């Protein structure tokens, strides 16, 4: 008996190129990494709005919409943290392969974690953006009161306080929001991203 292809649907689906031509843009992953309170989600939301104004389709993935949904069965053990990032990367790959500009905003504290995400998504489609705002500034902001709880020992293994954060070795871009305004951060990102994703209506 001939070996059956258990994934025959992949051979019949429209290609990534078909979808990118329909959208008039190239799919790419912008992976924002940095400490809690560094400005990742704020930048992601502002960038999405600017890209949307230009007729470009985007999707944000962050802790709120991932942990409350597909990853709501995961905790914060070492194993669960790896699985959290693995699932995010797999979801991100689906969006990127559909031609969507995907913006992921996650602490993702280890280089190995981010390298795993890059391998899943595809190195050529993965732009690592380091939101390098210093700990002292992030702790000063502490909008959710997490740093205060971590200092009191109420939160264990909190990145930057009781757990390490490994700065990216070769990020595509570094943004320190203690020195850059939100507008400056977004404009810097646009300068990086627009030439890569193409403009609506132009051949990509």
Curated annotation (Swiss-Prot):
Highest taxon of the lineage: Bacteria
The pathway is:
Sulfur metabolism; hydrogen sulfide biosynthesis; sulfite from sulfate: step 2/3
Q: Where is the active site?
A: 108 (phosphoserine intermediate)
| Gene3D superfamilies, A to Z | P-loop containing nucleotide triphosphate hydrolases
Supply the Pfam families for this chain. APS_kinase
Keywords linked to the UniProt accession: ATP-binding, Kinase, Nucleotide-binding, Phosphoprotein, Transferase
* Residues engaged in binding ATP: 34-41
- Please provide, alphabetically and separated by semicolons, the GO molecular function terms listed in this UniProt record: adenylylsulfate kinase activity; ATP binding
Q: Which GO BP terms apply?
A: hydrogen sulfide biosynthetic process; sulfate assimilation
- Enumerate the SUPFAM superfamilies for this protein: P-loop containing nucleoside triphosphate hydrolases
EC number of this enzyme: 2.7.1.25
- Primary enzyme class: transferase
Task: State the reactions this protein catalyses.
Answer: adenosine 5'-phosphosulfate + ATP = 3'-phosphoadenylyl sulfate + ADP + H(+)
The UniProt family comment states:
Belongs to the APS kinase family.
State the function annotated in the UniProt record.
Catalyzes the synthesis of activated sulfate.
Tell me the protein's name: Adenylyl-sulfate kinase
Gene encoding this chain?
Answer: cysC
